[in-house]
Amino acid sequence: MHHTVHVKDLRFSYPDGHAALNGVTLSIEPCEKVALVGPNGAGKSTLMLHLNGILHGQGEVKICGWSLENGNLGRVRAAVGLVFQDPDDQLFSPTVFEDVAFGPLHMGVPEAEVRERVAHALEAVGMGAYADRVSHHLSMGEKKRIAIATVLSMEPEILVLDEPSAGLDPRARRGLINLLRALPQTMLISTHDLPLVRELFPRTVVMDQGRIVADGPTQSILNDVPLLEAHGLEKM
C-alpha cells in the first residue's frame, strides 16, 4: 500500500533567495491525522503548497503513489483537498452552490453527479441549507465550513488545512473541531492552536527554519517543554 503522502529531501527557495524548505522528509499513512506546528516562517505553508503542485521544489513528492510529474498533476490536485487559511481566497462564485461545484465541474464530472457531490459535501459540513446563499455574506466560521466543502466535493484522499481555527470565536472553533473529528479522510493541518492539536491529532510534526525538528506522538511532543520553547511554541 502506498503512503498517502511521501516527501523525501524536499528543498525550496523563493526568488529572493530565502530557503524555505531545507531537506524535508515526511510520510503520512492512509487515514492518519497529523498536525504540523512551528513558528511563523518555519516552512509549514510552503510544504503544504508542494503537496498539490502549486509550488515545485527539488526532491521527491508523491501523493497516493503518484509523482507530481508525468501528467499526474490533475489527479494529484483532485486527491489533495487544500484549504487556505483565509476562506475568501477560496470562495469567489456568486453562490455557495457554485463555489462547491466549481472543482468537480472543472474536472469534467457530469452535472448530475456534481449536484450529488455538492449536496453531500454541504451536508458533511453542516451547511446543507446554504446552497443558494452568497458566500461573502456568511460569517467567518460559515465561510470556513464552505471552504472545506469545496474540497470535499472533489472526493479527496487527504485534507490539507492551513490554520483552520484562525479567526474563529469559541463557538465556531468548537464547531470546526467537531467537524474535523467527523471527517474520515487522511488529514494534515498546520496550526498554532495546540489545544486543538492535543484533542484531535495523534501525531505531531514540528518544523523550524525549513526543517522537521521533531516528529512523534502528540502527547509526547506537547509535553516536551524544552522542545516547545526552543521552537517558539507555547507550552500547554
Regions flagged by a language model, labelled:
Residues N52:
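Helix-to-loop junction immediately C-terminal to a conserved catalytic motif
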Residues G59-L68, V76:
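Conserved ABC transporter NBD signature motif
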Residues A112-Y130:
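Conserved ABC ATPase "signature" region
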Residues V134-L138, E142:
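Conserved ABC ATPase signature
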Residues T191-H192:
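H-loop/switch region of ABC-family ATPase nucleotide-binding domains
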Residues V197-E199:
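A short, surface-exposed alpha-helical micro-motif characterized by mixed small hydrophobic
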